[in-house]
Amino acid sequence: MLLGWQQNYRNWASTQQIYNRLISNISTLYPLPSTLYPLSVRLPLPQFSIGAKNPQHIAEVIETSTCEFLAQCLEPEDLKLAVMPTFGSIVKAADEESGNQILAVVYHATTAPIDSVHRARALGMSLDELREEQPQIFAMLKTEFKAAIIGFEDDKGQMYQYLPPRPPQIHQGVYQCDKEEIIRFSEQLEFLRTLLQVQGAPVEALTAATIREIHHLRSRDRSWLVTAGRTVSLILKDDYDRLRYVLSQIR
């Protein structure tokens, strides 16, 4: 019987051979001069981890700023596209210096080739057919999302609904917030004002999506939904068209 590390190494060696055979097919998807393709690509040695992966760990911060951050989704272990977090969902990442957990709402997501010069092209194949005939495609794609910062939780567990002193550092892990965290955070609704001011986002649709998400997590608590609607009404009291648009999507 093989030991765990022996089986992992055998799997790695097999993957190395398969990848080197498949690399020659890349030119059919993203044509380049043949001299630019390596004859062989050496994959990194496997990392033998003892602990189980946290299923809420979905991405890593690759760009950060005061009001938002950009994150790249972690690659799945099988031949699948990385799973995007849903529009309007709440995620978190840490500021290691202060111990704060930064909360943010996902407002934009993309999947694109890692190579920014050569675009993907239509192949007329289903995803199952691609996994069978062109599995290297999935290693050549990246999924990224932008999240607008709406508040933070300090190291004592206190929630705040304004911008933190610092955003999360680059390369920090991004996690999905659990139900209890979102319920505690949404006891106050000042974050809705921040959402309605996010630059470069469809803020009315984003606000409505976030309200629907929280309403679902709160077991469709009608009193909370009414309070959220009233809060939006106060914020947008001078803009009836925007107010009507938001309210029409949360009923």
Each predicted region: which residue ranges?
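A structural micro-motif recognizing beta-strand termini
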Residues: 72-80
